[in-house]
Amino acid sequence: VLKKCLPLLLLCTAPVFAKPVLTVYTYDSFAADWGPGPKIKKAFEADCNCELELVALEDGVSLLNRLRMEGKNSKADVVLGLDNNLLDAASKTGLFAKSGVAADAINVPGGWNNDTFVPFDYGYFAFVYDKNKLKNPPQSLKELVESDQNWRVIYQDPRTSTPGLGLLLWMQKVYGDDAPQAWQKLAKKTVTVTKGWSEAYGLFLKGESDLVLSYTTSPAYHILEEKKDNYAAANFSEGHYLQVEVAARTAASKQPELAQKFLQFMVSPAFQNAIPTGNWMYPVANVTLPAGFEKLTKPATTLEFTPAEVAAQRQAWISEWQRAVSR
């Protein structure tokens, strides 16, 4: 009888020993095998006595869209991959809780003052090109848009992608009320508009375009991983739009303490050291940058709207973009 009962007893007691699961919504390139996700998962699990589950979506704006849809029933404990341009919209959902992370642990351009969203990296949007193929890259956003050069361009959709939203705001900074006409001109050079960064960059690497919307730090991947220095970010005279990527814990999380622990871990060297050569962005903590980063384009001017300005205008600017590119 005991032999028969023993397996049943083990089955009944197994869940007692199950590790708690922390569910993190993020974007696909973060969670990918070649992204920082696997390294970060391993480091956090070694410390937390838990299981870290990364749920990958296409891009940062998709994360917010998904969370809005799921509301308080979301399985997400942490959302990682929103950015400075989505702060106001994300705050207004009421779905996030205060982080408990001290602002002095964070070093980003312009400083940081937000008790809910915690930066984990930052970078500057840029158009990346292959120096072997494109000998005369544009020197400004205006040249990219207005030149009669037949450059083929790929960028991301501002409704689903944070780089896409970044370009929308960059255009707005440079062109203001003339942005719709600029979008119409750029549409003539646009090969496609993708839902997320990974798809766009993949198409560019296959030779589908001359320029792709990415980051000033993207060439570091090719320099360090592939030992190739033929990829570069075009340095635009008007300046480059800043992106600060953030994470936050959800108010409805079933694992609030673990979620807070993860946000604290996020600004530690164990996480931050995985950023330069995993996410190919700048870290927010004082960690040593790998060789190769000194070769990267450094924007002379940083462009940025406040989160409140973005929240007030984002929908109108997206509608303008839609009308302009569909003509």
What are these regions (language model features)?
Residues 108-109, 123, 183-187, 193-194, ...:
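Periplasmic-binding protein-like
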Residues 292-327:
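Extracellular/periplasmic bilobal clamshell ligand-binding domains
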Residues 126-133, 172, 243-255, 274:
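A bilobed periplasmic-binding-protein/Venus flytrap-type ligand-binding module shared by bacterial periplasmic
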Residues 250-306:
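Mature extracytoplasmic/periplasmic domains
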Residues 21, 25-37, 58-62, 75-209:
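Extracytoplasmic ligand-binding site segments that recognize negatively charged/polar headgroups
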Residues 38-54:
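Short alpha-helix C-terminal cap/hinge motif
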Residues 96-103, 115-119, 142-145, 211, ...:
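Short beta-strand->loop
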Residues 85-89, 205, 209-230, 279:
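A ligand-binding cleft/hinge motif common to bilobed small-molecule-binding domains
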